Amino acid sequence: MSRRDKMIAKIKELMYKPEYIRNIGICAHIDHGKTTLSDNLLAGAGLISEDLAGEALGMDTKKDEQERGITIDAANASMVQEYEGEQYLINLIDTPGHVDFGGDVTRAMRAVDGAVVVVCAVDGVMPQTETVLKQALRENVKPVLFINKVDRLINELKLGPEELLKQLTSIIVEVNALIKSLAPKDKKNEWMVNVEEGSVAFGSAFKNWAINIPKMQETKFTFKDIIDYCNEGKEDELKQLLPLTEVLLNMVVKHLPSPNVAQVYRVPKIWDGDIESEVGQTMIKMSPDGPLAGMITNVAVDKHAGIVATCRIYGGTLEKSSEIYLVGSHGKARVQQAGIFMGAETIDTGKVPVGNIAYLTGVKGASAGETICSADCIIDEFEPIDHISEPVVTVAVEAKNTKDLPKLIEVLRQVSKEDPTIKVEINETTGEQLISGMGELHLEVVTNRIINDKKLEILVSEPIIVYKESVLGHSPVIEGKSPNKHNRFYIDVQPLDKPLYDALIEGDLKEGRIKTKETAQDFIELGMDKEEARRVWDVYNRSMFINMTRGIQYLDEVKELLLEGFEAALKDGPLANEEAVGLKFILSDAKLHEDAVHRGPAQVLPAIKKAIYASIMSANPCLLEPIQKVFISAPLEYMGNCNKDIQNRRGRIIGQETKGVIAEMDFEVPIAKMFGFAGDIRSATGGKGDFSTEMKGFETLPIYLQDDIVRQIRTRKGLSPEPYGPEHYSA
Ligand SMILES: Nc1nc2c(ncn2[C@@H]2O[C@H](COP(=O)(O)OP(=O)(O)OP(=O)(O)O)[C@@H](O)[C@H]2O)c(=O)[nH]1
C-alpha cells in the first residue's frame, strides 16, 4: 500500500472518532504566508512533493491563483498527524487574505472549529489580521497564533535575541488585545493565546521550521541557537530539527477543540432550532446515526463532476446515493459522490459522518450558506452566514454575441452560487446584467473566470460605484393612499439611531421580521425607547419598521403586505434607485377598508411604497458612498507624495507614525477615487511603498457632489435625470 493509500485508509477510520478530529482554517492578512504554510503542511503529510511545497502552491489550485500568486478561493485538505502516540485527522482550509475575498473566509469559518492565525513577524498585526480574527471569533472559532517569516527578522533585519523577543512579544500582546475585545464573552480569557502553554508558535513557513515552548523544552533549543544556525548558514538543518508540520499540527491538536467539544457551544450559536429536539441532540452528542444536518460553506463548478460543494457535517452521516433536502431553496437532490478533500483532489469515501468537512457532488441547486438534511427528516435552517463587507463596486456585462445571452444568464447564476458575496441583477430598463462585488480585483477575477473557465466571450463595463440612500432629517407624517383611496397609511421617517445602526452593521443585531418579544431587550440595551422597541415589526437593510398605532381594525391582516412593501421600497430608493439604509419608519395611523377584497396586495403595496418614498424625499435625502481605509508604508522622503496623492482623491489623513526611516500612514478614501491607485502609489513612492486596504463602510457623500452623482446614476439606469419630489407620491 502506498503512503497515500495508507493515509486514506486511516482517514476513513478516524472520520468516526470525533475526539481525534480537528477542523481548522488557516487565515491571515494578505501575503503573510498562509498558502506557503498550508503547502508545507500538505507536503509534510505526503500530499504534495516536498520540493514543490511553496512553489507548487498545492492549495492554490486555480490557474489565476498561481499566476497572481494569491489565494482567491478557500481550498481544503484532510491529513493525518501523530501526537503523543495517537493519530489525528486534520481537516484543513486555507483561506484568502485579500480584502476583496473576505467572503470566502467567513464561509470557511462556518466549517471549522479552530483557526491558525498567521502573522508576519516583520509586518506584525495588519488590518486584515483584525478582520479575519473577527470573522473567526464571531463564529465561535478558537484561534492559535503562528508568527511566520521569523527568518526575515534574523537574516534581513539582523535582530539579536533580545530584539527578536521584543518584536515577537509585541505581536502577541496585540493579537491578545484583539482576542480580548472580539471573543465571545465567556471565552475571552480562555481563548487568549499563551506562549508558555504553547498556543503560539514561531517560525518560517518558507524555510520549513517552527518552534514553540513545548518544542524548546523537548529539544533545549533557544532563540539564540536559531539565530546562530541562521548566521552560520545552517538554516536547512533547522527543518530537520524543528519540523514545521510537527510543531504546527501538535499545537493544533493540543490547543484547538475537537468537533465533539466545539459543537456543544457552536451549534446553539449557529442553529436556531430546538436543542432538545432529536436533531439538536444529534448535533450536540455527535451521533452519526441521527438525522443528517449539514451546512454548505462553499460551491465550485468542476468541468467533469459539475457542482462540488464543501459541507460541514454537524449531525448524522452524509451518504452517497442518498436523497437530501436543501432547506433554504426547498429542493431535493441525490448525492452522487460523498468524500473528503485532498488539496486539488477529492477522495470519494462513500460516507462522511458528523464532525467532518465533506465534499459532495450531484447537488445541482446547492449554494454556499444552504442547510442540508435528509429528505425524510427536514430540519430548521442554520443561521445565515453574515458577511462583514458588502458589495461596493458593480460592472455591467453583456455577451459579445447576442445568441450567448441565455448562456450568460446561466453562467451568472452559477457565479453567484459559487460566491455569495457577488450580487447579480438585471437593470430592468437597459437589460444590462450587473455584477456587484467587494472591489475592483474581485470583479476582475470573476469576469476573467467567466471568459477563461466558462468560455464565454463577454464585454465588461468600467467599474461603477455602489451608492446607498438615506436621510439626514426627520420627515413630517406622510399619508400614503391606495389606488382605490379606501386605505391610508400615515408614516414618518428619520435616521435610525447610531448604536442600533452600528450593531446591525457589526452583525451584533440580526435583521428579519420580529417573531419574539425577546428581541426588544436587545434594542432597549442599545438605547432604544422601550415602547418603540416592543413595537418593531421588521428590521431590513439596517432600517426598522415600527408600528405605533393602537387598535386599528384589520391591521394585522395587512401586516405581511405592509412589510413586503416596506422591504421592496428599500431595495430601490426614490433618490437614485439604490438601496435605502439606516432609516426608522414609524407607522402612526392607518385607515383600512372593512372588506378584505378592497385591501388586497394591489391596494396595500403601492400605498405603503408611496408613503415610504414620499417620507424619504421629505426628510432631506442623501447618498452614502463606500469608503476604504488605506494603509501606506513607505520611506519617509515619500510621505509628502503619498499625502498629496490621497488628498487628490478626496481622502482624509487619519494618522501618521514614523518607525525608523519608514513612515506608516493611515487614510480614508472614497472607493470612487481609488481606481488606478496601485500604479499611482507605486510611482509616488519610487516603487518602495507598500499598501493595503480595508473596507470602512458607507458615509454621506459631500452634499456639493450629490446632485451630479444622482443625475449620473439615474441617467445610467435609464430614469429621468431628476428624482421626483414628495408631492409626486401623494397623488
Ligand atoms: N522569508 C520568508 N518568506 C515567506 C515566508 N512565508 C511566506 N513567504 C513569502 O511570502 C510571500 C507570500 O506568501 P503566501 O504563502 O502566498 O501568502 P498568503 O498569505 O497565502 O497570501 P494570499 O494567499 O494571497 O493571501 C511569498 O513570496 C512567500 O514565498 C517565510 O516564512 N519567510
UniProtKB/Swiss-Prot annotation:
Q: Which Gene3D superfamilies match?
A: 3.30.230.10, 3.30.70.240, Elongation Factor G (Translational Gtpase), domain 3, P-loop containing nucleotide triphosphate hydrolases, Translation factors
Q: Name one Pfam family in it.
A: GTP_EFTU
Q: One MF term in GO for this entry? A: GTP binding
Top-level taxon of origin: Archaea
Q: Which residues carry this modification: Diphthamide?
A: 598
Asked if the Swiss-Prot or TrEMBL record annotates the protein with the keyword Cytoplasm, the reply is yes
Enumerate the spans annotated as tr-type G domain.
19-234
Q: Which protein is depicted?
A: Elongation factor 2
Per the UniProt record, the source organism is Methanobrevibacter ruminantium (strain ATCC 35063 / DSM 1093 / JCM 13430 / OCM 146 / M1)
The uppermost taxa in this organism's lineage are: Archaea, Methanobacteriati, Methanobacteriota, Methanomada group, Methanobacteria
